[in-house]
Amino acid sequence: MALPHDSNETSYLLPPNNEDWGRQTIPDFVYGQKDLMAEGIQWPRNAPGIPDALPQSPFDAALCSAWKQRVELGLFRYRLRELQTQILPGAVGFVAQLNVERGVQRRPPQTIKSVRQAFDPVQFNFNKIRPGEVLFRLHREPDLPGTLLQEDILVVINVSPLEWGHVLLVPEPARQLPQRLLPGALRAGIEAVLLSLHPGFRVGFNSLGGLASVNHLHLHGYYLAHRLPVEQAPSEPLDPGGHLHLLQDLPAPGFLFYTRGPGPDLESLISRVCRATDYLTDHEIAHNLFVTRGAPPGKTSPSSALTGVRVILWARKSSFGIKDGEAFNVALCELAGHLPVKTSQDFSSLTEAAAVALIQDCRLPPSQAEDVQAALVALMSQEEQ
């Protein structure tokens, strides 16, 4: 079982007096490979509500208890209540949720002009957040004595939450890393999914130009008590080694990487994904990434078991800034099939066809999409040599 450094019990809660928050040491959530649960996590027959409705791992318990306390302390921009949710009729299975307050009260996005934009310490970044916004530090124990320690990751509340338990995974904020995916950050995101007993705990990444609103390296993590299309969508292999697949039956086709769990296979996946995102960043191509438990590649069905972790990568048109007139903005969760809608009118009138049109508007032109696919296939082939 994952344990804190120096005791059998640790508290991820803030002390009663807010004057003590800044003086309190950030608690560590320490875990090892034995705590990563790759198999046996499935959706119950009746979809659960908030994470409390399912068995909790130590990670779930730490995150949910600390997050709930921050709600009670008023550290969010609004108090998230149970969101009105509907499954849009149609073949895709979009999960639409009405979240008016996020649309109105979220922090305005920074001015971004390039996928490769440098970190700017003058702009808002995660070194400027209030002490109470940090829940804990993810600390991975080395698998073997003498192996390199992995970087620590801060788990921070998203003050404008999409859903219950919405957090940001921030690698060592003092390093002032720009919003460019790195292997350590991706590893922490995948392992967070494997630390949770909830099949609906997902992690994602938005690049600059892919609707990242802060240019300081971070991933999103949150609970959603609904299946999503990307979990079991069928795929076709793109490379002879079977490392890269195409999810074709989605409004925006995505590149699928898959692992059965921790070990060398996971490390190889992290390397392949980051080589792909490095290529996209270096070529000024915006992208979004989504991590979820899911079925293996190939032909699947709605009853396919969640036997591993799917990492889906979308290359897309750059979009700098928020489009206020749309029902939703297309980023990591929308591409995966989760649609946080900004107004009651749009929520009541939204159709699958309208959602598909908004998402497809973000797709690269066909010729550029073909070039990107060929380049990523070539990258995977180089790894085999």
UniProtKB/Swiss-Prot annotation:
Catalytic activity: GDP-alpha-D-glucose + phosphate = alpha-D-glucose 1-phosphate + GDP + H(+)
InterPro entries associated with the record: GDPGP
Keyword Hydrolase listed: yes
Gene Ontology molecular function, alphabetical: GDP-D-glucose phosphorylase activity; guanyl-nucleotide exchange factor activity; hydrolase activity; nucleotide binding
Record GO biological process: glucose metabolic process
Any one cellular-component term (Gene Ontology): cytoplasm
UniProt keyword Phosphoprotein, yes or no: no
Family in the record: Belongs to the GDPGP1 family.
More about this protein: The orthologs in A.thaliana are GDP-L-galactose phosphorylases catalyzing the first reaction of the Smirnoff-Wheeler pathway, the major route to ascorbate biosynthesis in plants.
Role, per record: Specific and highly efficient GDP-D-glucose phosphorylase regulating the levels of GDP-D-glucose in cells.
Entry protein name: GDP-D-glucose phosphorylase 1
Natural source organism: Homo sapiens
Taxonomic placement: Eukaryota, Metazoa, Chordata, Craniata, Vertebrata
